[in-house]
């Protein structure tokens, strides 16, 4: 029988070191379950020996707390089946009664912006006007119908499944979209679903990402979008595309700062001190996370020129920016280690009572 620990289910080793350091600093035993095509499911078969990429469905999973941080962009790193592997592992863990943070229902949110949009809209949040288009053939005609409701207004496309700004482009006309769809540059969504959304203007060229751990506020991050990139991943390991690429513009970008004019030495991520745990939107989001049993998340919103607070993304495999971590009195990774370590201690106390 293995020693109870926190098991982290993921597919990208490059994102793990800050978390590993946090678990070590908090003296929380941790193990990785790396679900890639060439990896096993170490520790899940009830002992400390790595398996060969399989699980015995009749065996009990190793004791401990399981935290899923599978990424919707796994396929961009050559891990096309990682999400399916995770579905299988999470189902096995949940049927066995193990404690799983960000379980199967959260994975389905991570891999579907359609699901995120529906959940946020049903909860009463202001969300972007969105049409989901299945396949490539109807994309242009769907855009014609979409733009007819807001003539002359620009719009964006994005992939239903995937982070890192996958498939996100701004178009001023349907004709521009038609040319893109017929060009070699067209990015086919991994699940075949492309979203059409209103292009929203922010009061200033930034968006805000609020980090939550254990469903509670950690800090809010100001993300400068003046350089024009849709790549908002805060981790050092994320590859940020060249600012100002033709056809792209970041959420909230305005003419006051043209693409490519952002200070090259300035980190686009910084603490937003005016957004605290007492902010009305933060309190609503905490209630939303509790209602939907989402333990760890980064949620993004923008403040628009017409006075709206538009919530547009739920990221359940959140990464933390080093520059933000260096200036924040609270650490995201340490908060996770403390939260999961607390769950582990509580579970062990029940077992030994």
Task: Name what the model sees in each region.
Residues 11-134:
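Conserved N-proximal alpha/beta basic substrate-recognition cap immediately N-terminal to
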Residues 155, 217-219, 297, 310-312:
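Protein kinase-like catalytic core scaffold
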Residues 166-289:
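Phosphate-binding site of ATP-dependent enzymes
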Residues 2, 97, 105-205, 248, ...:
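Active-site nucleotide/adenylate-binding loops and adjacent lid/helix of ATP-dependent enzymes
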């Amino acid at each position: 029988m293995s020693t109870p620990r926190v098991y982290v289910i993921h597919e990208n080793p490059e994102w793990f070191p800050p978390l590993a350091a946090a678990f070590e600093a908090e003296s929380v035993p941790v193990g990785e379950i790396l679900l890639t095509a060439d990896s096993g499911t170490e520790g899940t078969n009830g002992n400390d020996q790595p398996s060969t990429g399989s699980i015995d469905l009749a065996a009990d999973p190793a004791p401990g707390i399981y935290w899923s941080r599978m990424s919707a962009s796994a396929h961009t790193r050559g891990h096309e089946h990682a999400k399916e592997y995770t579905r299988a592992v999470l189902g096995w863990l949940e049927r066995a009664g193990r404690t799983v943070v960000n379980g199967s229902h959260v994975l389905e949110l991570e891999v579907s912006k359609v699901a995120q949009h529906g959940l946020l809209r049903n909860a009463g949040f202001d969300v972007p006007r969105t049409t989901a288009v299945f396949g490539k053939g109807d994309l242009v005609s769907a855009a014609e119908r979409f733009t007819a409701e807001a003539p002359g207004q620009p719009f964006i496309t994005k992939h239903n499944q995937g982070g890192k700004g996958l498939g996100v482009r701004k178009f001023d006309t349907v004709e521009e979209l038609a040319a893109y769809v017929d060009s070699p540059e067209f990015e086919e969504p991994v699940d075949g679903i492309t979203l059409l959304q209103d292009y929203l203007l922010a009061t200033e060229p930034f968006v805000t990402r609020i980090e939550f751990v254990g469903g509670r506020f950690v800090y809010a991050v100001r993300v400068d979008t003046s350089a024009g990139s849709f790549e908002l991943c805060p981790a050092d390991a994320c590859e940020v595309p060249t600012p100002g690429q033709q056809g792209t513009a970041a959420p909230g970008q305005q003419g006051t700062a043209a693409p490519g004019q952002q200070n090259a030495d300035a980190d686009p991520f910084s603490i937003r001190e005016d957004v605290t745990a007492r902010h009305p939107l933060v309190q609503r989001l905490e209630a939303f996370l509790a209602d939907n049993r989402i333990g760890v998340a980064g949620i993004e919103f923008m403040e628009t020129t017409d006075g709206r607070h538009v919530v547009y993304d739920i990221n359940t495999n959140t990464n933390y920016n080093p520059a933000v971590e260096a200036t924040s009195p609270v650490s995201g990774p340490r908060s996770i280690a403390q939260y999961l370590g607390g769950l582990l201690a509580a579970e062990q106390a029940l077992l030994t009572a």
